[in-house]
A protein has these predicted regions:
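Short S/T/G/P-rich N-terminal loop/turn motif that feeds into the first structured element of a domain
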Residues: 1-70, 78-84, 110-129
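Conserved, mostly hydrophobic/aromatic
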Residues: 74
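A common structural junction motif
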Residues: 91-102
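A short, structured active-site edge motif that brings together acidic residues
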Residues: 103-111
C-alpha cells in the first residue's frame, strides 16, 4: 500500500525542562552543553526538519520547573512522525567524548498536524481594499 499523500506537514512540539545537572553546572560546562544541544538540533535539520519557533518561559520561572514539567519549548515541521525516535536518540546516547544531553534536559514531544483552517484564517495576508 502506498503512503497517503497529505496536503499538510507534520508538526512537533518539543517540551523541555532543566535537570539538576544543568542548574548546578558552572557556566563553562553550560556553554559546552548548550553547543551540544544546538548541534543535536542541527542534526534534526539535516534529517529534513524545520524549526518554526521557540519559547523560553524565563519570565515566569527561574530554575527547574515545579508546578509545570517544562520551561522551554520549540515548534518544528517534521517529514514524518516515524522520525521522532531518531531525533531524540542523540539526547540519550552514551558515547565516548559526547555529552549525554538527557543528563541536563528532560525532553518530551507532541506530534500532530496543523489546524489548517485556523492557520488560513489568521496567517493569510489581509485582503486589500
Amino acid at each position: 500500500m502506498a503512503p497517503t499523500e497529505r496536503p499538510w506537514p507534520w508538526r512537533m512540539i518539543v517540551r523541555g525542562g532543566f535537570q539538576d545537572a544543568w542548574s548546578q553546572a558552572p557556566q563553562a560546562e553550560k556553554n559546552e552543553v548548550f553547543a551540544a544541544w544546538i548541534a543535536a538540533q542541527r542534526g534534526w535539520v539535516e534529517l529534513g526538519c524545520r524549526l518554526i519557533s521557540t519559547l523560553d518561559d524565563e519570565l515566569n520561572m527561574v530554575g527547574q520547573p515545579r508546578g509545570r514539567l517544562w520551561n522551554f519549548y520549540s515548534l518544528w515541521e517534521i517529514p514524518d512522525p516515524g522520525i521522532v525516535y531518531d531525533l531524540l536518540n542523540p539526547f540519550r546516547t552514551e558515547a565516548e567524548g559526547v555529552i549525554r544531553l538527557d543528563r541536563y534536559f528532560s525532553i518530551e514531544t507532541v506530534v500532530g498536524k496543523p489546524i489548517n483552517s485556523l492557520e488560513r484564517a489568521l496567517l493569510a495576508p489581509p485582503a486589500s481594499s
